[in-house]
A protein has these predicted regions:
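Long, contiguous, secondary-structure-rich segments that constitute the structural scaffold
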Residues: 139-193, 285-287, 291-302, 306-391
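Alpha-helical scaffold elements adjacent to nucleotide-binding pockets in ATP/GTP-utilizing enzyme cores
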Residues: 72, 99-102, 146-149
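Extended redox/cofactor-interaction regions of prokaryotic respiratory oxidoreductases
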Residues: 1-99, 107-112, 199-311
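Conserved small-residue motifs centered on glycine
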Residues: 196
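Short strand-coil-strand connectors
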Residues: 125, 223-224, 268, 322-326
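Hydrophobic alpha-helical scaffolding
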Residues: 45, 62-66, 120, 132-141, ...
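Flexible glycine/proline-rich, aromatic-decorated loop/lid segments
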Residues: 95-130
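Phosphate/diphosphate-binding loops
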Residues: 75, 81-85, 91-94, 129-151, ...
């Protein structure tokens, strides 16, 4: 897609080069010093030296709701000798916010001035001016104010802020952006009109256009500079990484069933494959607490009529979805749009457990696993075996 060269907030260089997959953060709390480059995908070092001891969770719900295997995460976070401090900053009392040691309110979009970037669609890009409508309520501060206060106490305020407020940074970045995008109006004009759009002057985006026109002069970022069918980099990884049984990394695009597949012996106990999907009433878990959206777009488990008939399940019946990791109670949607042997839950529903940890909100991550995908060490959210019964 076409995007505008709008200048963004500069970032300081992080002196720490060691990193892990975001999905592995619970493992880094539980067994950090055991995690290695060859077994766990640690980058920048052969192994982690220390576990995670503090979490700063800003405007995110990955602490609980959007992270796999909620019950395991809950147990890890219960022990405050492991992760000793959790700071959460948000506008809503999310599932993640309930696990905070320090919980701070963030300013809403209506309470501060900002730019909305990353707005592009096909051959058109746009920038939105998000103006302040009301003053921050009570003692709310913007995240820029919070981090500036932290920088002040750490002795690096000038290096961090460069002497600018949030609005002054916006004006500074906008002036730089006007040099790259001459069509931009003045700051005050843009503030009044609220949005700026620009179409791709080339008409439409052509993927890898320069490479296609001259592959020698414009190589890709692959080791060979070409589109690779056989990946030597993957071959090297497959030969050196320590993979658990069932995990496969191959230099060629091949089929591999993976763990918790229909071929897994666990299939006898949990015969249904549970997959997730992005639901129309939410962006992940954002808007998952809005009552009118929840009423208009009910959270349901989709199931094929053949699987439903075997279990005496009719459309709208309350069912229990369960495996060794947890249990969810939710209504069933019986539909031929699902393949036999497969059920589905829209991801992002807000976790709502009872006293026995049975979730009544339809949160798929009660049932997902924290076993990472083989290569990226990422979220295997569609790889879950479950059983379904009528309640």
């Amino acid at each position: 897609t076409y995007s505008l060269p709008f200048v963004r907030m500069p970032t300081l260089e992080n002196p720490i080069q060691t990193s892990i997959s975001m999905f592995m953060w619970t493992d880094a709390i539980e067994r950090g010093p055991e995690m290695t480059a060859l077994r766990d995908g640690v980058r920048g070092k052969d192994k982690l030296d220390v576990p995670i001891k503090m979490i700063w969770n800003y405007a995110g719900n990955c602490l609980i709701n959007q992270h796999s295997e909620i019950n395991r995460t809950h147990e890890i976070l219960q022990d405050d000798k492991k992760c000793e401090l959790i700071v959460v900053i948000d506008c809503h009392m999310t599932s993640s916010a309930k696990y905070a040691d320090i919980l701070l309110p963030d300013c809403t979009a209506s309470e501060q001035m900002d730019f909305a970037l990353d707005a592009s669609c096909g051959n058109m890009s746009y920038v939105i001016f998000n103006d302040q409508v009301i003053k921050p309520r009570f003692e709310c501060k913007t995240i820029y104010e919070m981090t500036s206060e932290l920088a002040k106490r750490l002795g690096v305020e000038q290096q961090f802020t460069e002497g600018r407020t949030q609005e002054e940074w916006m004006r500074h970045l906008y002036a730089q952006s006007r040099e790259a995008i001459p069509e931009l109006p003045t700051f005050e004009e843009f503030r009044k009109q609220g949005i700026f759009k620009k179409r791709d002057p080339q008409g439409h985006h052509v993927a890898y256009k320069a490479f296609r026109e001259d592959p020698q002069a414009n190589p890709l970022t692959t080791p060979s500079g070409k589109i690779e069918i056989y990946s030597q980099a993957l071959a090297d990884i497959a030969a050196t990484w320590e993979l658990p049984e069932g995990d496969v990394i191959d230099p060629l695009p091949i089929y591999t069933p993976g763990f918790e597949s229909y071929q897994d012996p666990l299939n006898k106990q949990y015969p249904l494959q549970l997959t997730g999907f992005h639901y129309k009433s939410r962006v992940h878990s954002t808007y998952g607490n809005v009552d009118v959206l929840k009423a208009a777009c009910r959270q349901e488990m989709w199931i094929n009529p053949l699987d439903a008939q075997k279990r005496g399940i009719h459309n709208g019946d309350k069912v229990r979805i369960f495996n060794d990791r947890g249990e969810v109670h939710i209504e069933a949607k019986v539909t031929p749009r699902m393949m036999p042997g497969v059920v589905a839950l829209g991801e992002g529903a807000w976790y709502d457990p009872d006293t026995k940890r049975v979730d009544k909100g339809g949160c798929i991550n009660v049932l997902t696993t924290q076993r990472p995908s083989p290569l990226a060490k990422g979220n295997p959210s569609h790889t879950n075996l479950v059983q379904v019964e009528k309640v």
